[in-house]
Swiss-Prot record:
Lineage of the species this protein comes from: Bacteria, Bacillati, Bacillota, Bacilli, Bacillales
UniProt cofactor(s): Mg(2+)
Protein name: DNA integrity scanning protein DisA
HAMAP family referenced in this protein's UniProt entry, alphabetically: DisA
Residues annotated to bind ATP: 75, 93, 106-110
Amino acid sequence: MEENKQRVKSMINILQLVAPGTPLREGIDNVLRAQTGGLIVLGYNEQIKSIVDGGFHINCAFSPASLYELAKMDGALILNETGSKILISNAQLVPESSIDSIETGMRHRTAERVAKQTGSLVVAISQRRNVITLYQGNLRYTLKDIGVILTKANQAIQTLEKYKAVWNDGITNLGILEFEEVVTMSEVVHVLHSVEMVLRIKNEILSYIHELGTEGRLIRLQLTELLADLEAEAALLIKDYYQEKTQDHHQILKKLQELANTQLLEDSDLVKLLGYPGQTSLEESVTPRGYRITSKISRVPPLIIENLINRFKTLQGVCRATINELDDVEGIGEVRAKKIREGLKRIQEHLYMSRHN
């Protein structure tokens, strides 16, 4: 899993470097349109030095126009790691010929071998096929047309909307069961599965956003709007049902995100994520602490909610508390105690109305 996280992080960094709207991408697109082809290496360390033969050491500031003009030469361009300077033009690259390559064209084969030998980012721009291919270590990625990525991103947003609706239905049903004191592990796991799918699709959309660069602003806004409050509520859901109260619920949500990125989770995986043994029955009754529901009461800060849960232990404990008992909790006076009682009643009524709509 750690290796996969590293690969994802590397790919995000690479895509941000060559995303539309960046000077480097503008230069690459100019070369692509001119159909001259090109080979660009980012980074000039000892390993790169050992495979560079000839070339002109120009050490000038990067500009898209300079890249376009210098790419007309047959050799490779060597840039610094950030792409802000062009260090060498028309360089011949001589990587180890024994390094395996799946490529057939000379330019792409050289790019793949250089990337594998040095770990540097290498960009190969095809002369005839209008394709930009990125290499770094064993990573290989072909940049897609912006129109294709936008179509995929919009499809993913539509899919996310469907899973958001599944989440809304599940969390509404769970809220009703919480007030009725009939929650089982099955209902909690069902809601967590919808969180898993939302997080999985979110990760896919983020990869499109990274690749789209400035063209992805609208997609990012849609994603932010769709996920508003969902992740915060999911963290409180975990806080409600995690076996040990002291566990950091944000860390558990982060772990769920990591797992969702790498595999489809079974019911037992989610049960274990909540701190229970994997063989725990899904029919087992579970009791919410009440963080998620009480956080919906207006003008009740998190510190007061913490005091409430510490005093009454569960959501039902809070619901059953009298005005005087609520008044005894630190930070809650008579006025706030009444607001808490009224707030819980309104939330319960809203949940029942939502289920029947």
